[in-house]
């Protein structure tokens, strides 16, 4: 666990924690803990079962007294691969991780997940069918945001499906993706204990060209908010060859909102219901902005 004077100059808040296996999580100023990240995902949502790599050793560079960042090194190991990670952690209004990963597959890996994110989505205001809960919404993240290599901006609302659901968004050299918590009004959740309105968003910014591949979104059915049921990651189109060094770098933004500003007005709500005039379905999409 790493502590720093983030909210007050006289108190060292917990900034991030490495949680076991390859899981870790972080917060920025005034956040409460929410979604997590992992070092590497292998065979996620595959019929044969998932492989869970683990960080087996850590090294910490001692920061100077005036330092605004700290460097963590980690060794990851699993049956299929080993990897070395370097994290530069900078806490603040948004907490930034600069990540360098050097991966050595022991076998060819086709079902790999780079920069995997793990979150929870139970329900929201627009999908409360069958929900018996006083709260309007319960989720750590409400949507997958994508900024493609072609500049397209995509927002995919999350769901709690009846069966396992996997979606893939093909891309070349993505500019970024993340699991975002956009609703920041306490009234959107009305939960004084969980404070979902203060959960961080997590945006992944590739550093360098990632080539062809796809952002995968895995949605797992759940009936309780204690279970993480959302996974998102980047999967290269070509399998990772065994015995070859693979290097990737990316920046993680644990933030209140996406670190890039869209020039498009965002969709804030989508409502669906029966038409009052015939048997058709009526879709009402609310957009806020002037573009």
Feature roles, as predicted:
Residues 1-50, 58-64:
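Auxiliary tRNA-acceptor-end handling modules of aminoacyl-tRNA synthetases
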Residues 7-33, 114, 119-248, 253-263:
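A contiguous, surface-exposed recognition patch within enzymatic or periplasmic domains that forms
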Residues 34-92, 208-228:
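Extended, loop-rich substrate-binding clefts of extracytoplasmic carbohydrate-active enzymes
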Residues 55-58, 83-86, 232-237, 268-272, ...:
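Short structured motifs
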Residues 74, 97-105, 250, 281-289:
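Short, well-ordered beta-strand segments enriched in hydrophobic/aromatic residues
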Residues 86-135:
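Acidic (Asp/Glu-rich), glycine- and aromatic
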Residues 88-94, 237-242, 273-276:
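Short, solvent-exposed beta-strand/turn "edge" segments of beta-rich domains on protein surfaces
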Residues 260-290:
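Surface beta-strand/loop "capping" patches
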